[in-house]
């Protein structure tokens, strides 16, 4: 007779969780950041607010964003004037859009990840779906399971309303699932659409305007599993260690509230300061066991909440400018896509590392860190180990 300990041991994987594939997707509608203020104030019938428009133009100029992708086109917004007002009841219209479009965009990213993985989708055992764009029952996880044709007994986890730190959260959960369920293959999907947050400008709510200058739409998917099958599965990164913490004295720093008017955001001015003040401790906990204290010796994937956060983190840690290159490139080309951002950066980094002839998926380095920052203020930390190219 086998013991309980033997049964437990047999259920667990032998090696660490690895990322086996990455896929990304964006809506076709591309928005140029340099002309966005003109478009935004015109479509929201706010062109008379000249001072506010100038302020918004400065926000967009300082954002370090060149372009973003958005599901919302001019035609859609003209059909839904309440979404263009500052605080008009519009939740039904927003919900009708996102409950369809969030799983649809997620499917596009997931299909690419499954193709790269190269295994039949029947081998997917778990699904994690994450979005801050709309809520429904059954959820986007159910819709995606149906749309992809996954087996009905795939174990699903639906994460709604997590916000910008959740790219780290999904990797933490996927790591635990992969390492504690032998043979598990976890499909992780983050899909975000700004139709829930788009609204007209107001000079009494400038943090809403910050969101209008930064947020973009995108979906990213990864396959996570332990003990990759040799010659069949090709790991890209190992997920070595994870943590989540609430920054002290940060209550109200980033809040989001779902109301009749859609999802509203409230930001304290010192969000970059709170993040940079707490980053040292998070890094020490993560890398002290590895005897790493030189943070220029690791590769960096940080949620690009905005350029000010990246600037202050760089300054606090004395990071070389090239450390945040992949992060800044994704911010520039896509804007802040909330939970999907860090997965886009992982994809960007492994592609550029290969293109530039570097030895590992982590810009030629062995160890790296992935950070998520969001409501709470919550900080997610993931220690990554790159793979030889």
From Swiss-Prot:
Keyword flag DNA-binding: no
EC number from the UniProt entry: 2.3.1.74
Keyword Acyltransferase: yes
One GO MF term attached to the UniProt entry: naringenin-chalcone synthase activity
Tree of life domain: Eukaryota
Main EC class the enzyme belongs to: transferase
GO terms of biological process kind: flavonoid biosynthetic process; polyketide biosynthetic process
Family statement: Belongs to the thiolase-like superfamily. Chalcone/stilbene synthases family.
Record-given protein name: Chalcone synthase
Gene assigned in the entry: CHS
């Amino acid at each position: 007779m086998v013991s309980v300990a033997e049964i437990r041991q047999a259920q667990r994987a032998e090696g660490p969780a690895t990322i086996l594939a990455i896929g990304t997707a964006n809506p076709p509608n591309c928005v140029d950041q340099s002309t966005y203020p003109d478009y935004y104030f015109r479509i929201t019938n706010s062109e008379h607010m000249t001072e506010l428009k100038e302020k918004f133009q400065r926000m967009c100029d300082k954002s370090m964003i060149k372009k973003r992708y958005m599901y919302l086109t001019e035609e859609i917004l003209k059909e839904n004037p309440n979404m263009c007002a500052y605080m008009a009841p519009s939740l039904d219209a927003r919900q009708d859009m996102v409950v369809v479009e969030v799983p649809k965009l997620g499917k596009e990213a997931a299909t690419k990840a499954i193709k790269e993985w190269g295994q039949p989708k029947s081998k997917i055992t778990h699904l994690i779906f994450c979005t801050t764009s709309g809520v429904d029952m059954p959820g986007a996880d159910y819709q995606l399971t149906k749309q992809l044709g996954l087996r009905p007994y795939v174990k699903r986890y639906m994460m709604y309303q997590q916000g910008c730190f959740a790219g780290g959260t999904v990797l933490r959960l996927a790591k635990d699932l992969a390492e504690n369920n032998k043979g598990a293959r976890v499909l992780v999907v983050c899909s975000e659409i700004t139709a829930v947050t788009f609204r007209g400008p107001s000079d009494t709510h400038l943090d809403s305007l910050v969101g209008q200058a930064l947020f973009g739409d995108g979906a990213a998917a990864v396959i996570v599993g332990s003990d990759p099958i040799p010659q069949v599965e090709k790991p890209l990164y190992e997920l070595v260690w994870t943590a989540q913490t609430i920054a002290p004295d940060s209550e109200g720093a980033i809040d989001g509230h779902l109301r009749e008017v859609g999802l509203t955001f409230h930001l304290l001015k010192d969000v970059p300061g709170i993040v940079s003040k707490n980053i040292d401790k998070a890094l020490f906990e993560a890398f002290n066991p590895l005897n790493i204290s030189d943070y220029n010796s690791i590769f960096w994937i940080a949620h690009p909440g905005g350029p000010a956060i990246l600037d202050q983190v760089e300054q606090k840690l004395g990071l070389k400018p090239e450390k945040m290159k992949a992060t800044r490139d994704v911010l520039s080309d896509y804007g802040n896509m909330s939970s999907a951002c860090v997965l886009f950066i992982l994809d960007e980094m492994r592609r550029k590392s290969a293109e530039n002839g570097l030895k590992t998926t982590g810009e030629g380095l062995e160890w790296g860190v992935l950070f998520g920052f969001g409501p709470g203020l919550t900080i997610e930390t993931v220690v990554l180990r790159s793979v030889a190219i």
